[in-house]
Regions:
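Gly/Ala-rich beta-loop-alpha elbow adjacent to hydrolase catalytic centers
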Residues: 81-85, 89
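Short beta-strand immediately N-terminal to the catalytic nucleophile in serine-hydrolase-like folds
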Residues: 79-81, 104, 137
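Serine-hydrolase catalytic machinery in alpha/beta-hydrolase-like enzymes
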Residues: 1-74, 122, 170-172
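Conserved alpha/beta-hydrolase "acid-adjacent" motif
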Residues: 143-149
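Short beta-strand/loop motif that positions the catalytic acidic residue
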Residues: 129-130, 136-138, 142, 163
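C-terminal catalytic histidine-bearing segment of alpha/beta-hydrolase fold enzymes
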Residues: 157-198
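Conserved serine/cysteine hydrolase catalytic core
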Residues: 116-133, 189, 193-195
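A conserved short beta-strand
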Residues: 97-112
Length: 198
């Protein structure tokens, strides 16, 4: 099986190089991660990156995800993403290219500052099909995934795994103050099982 990883808003960096190598080794998959801001030179300043999200195009990001999946050279490909990358996982549910999808704390509705003519609403894409392929990993204290929106996810057929004491970004970066080791281990284990399920 293959796996495409959509990084968080900070994009490709050693954290994701290491994650690709680790999951390829431990999960016995062919794994690739892609840069969400290709052909742009951005600093690590989150305000700068937040301002650039509205300039992204859903169609271009989906094209990049498809090309990454094709580059893996396997028929069955899963998708996993974090934060903004998790939001794009929700948007990718409209595609039949990904057999299973796991979104880690992906936005359910497009944040106001990210709205543009090229940015569709994640929940609308999920309503369009294949929501049953999506596992949403959610921290109950995450302001980007409030309880009323989580209910909307459930309402369109997404499988939700909530972690009651977790905030945004609790699983993929051990350097973050929000990191919760036990919850992260559980979330990755559930994601592996989800991706491998037929």
């Amino acid at each position: 099986m293959g796996l495409v990883i959509m990084p968080d808003i900070f994009g490709m960096r050693p954290l994701f190089d290491d994650l690709v190598a680790r999951l390829a080794r431990e999960w016995n998959m062919v794994v690739i991660a892609i840069e969400p801001f290709p052909n742009q030179t951005l600093s690590a300043d989150i305000a700068e990156r937040m301002a650039c999200v509205s300039l992204l195009s859903d169609d271009a990001v989906l094209r990049d995800m498809h090309e990454a999946a094709d580059a893996l050279g396997v028929d069955r490909v899963g998708l996993m993403g974090f934060c903004m990358g998790g939001m794009y996982c929700h948007k990718a549910a409209r595609s039949d290219r990904f057999a299973r999808i796991s979104s880690f704390y992906g936005m359910i509705h497009i944040p106001e500052g990210w709205m543009s003519a090229t940015q569709g609403d994640p929940l609308t894409y999920l309503e369009g099909g294949n929501a049953d392929r999506v596992l949403a990993i959610i921290g109950s204290l995450d302001p980007y995934t409030p309880p009323d929106q989580v209910l909307e996810l459930l309402g369109v057929g997404v499988t939700v795994q909530e972690y009651p004491e977790a905030v945004h970004g609790f699983a993929h970066d051990v350097a973050r103050p929000a990191h919760r080791a036990h919850d992260a281990q559980d979330a990755f284990s559930r994601t592996r099982d989800w991706l491998l399920a037929q």
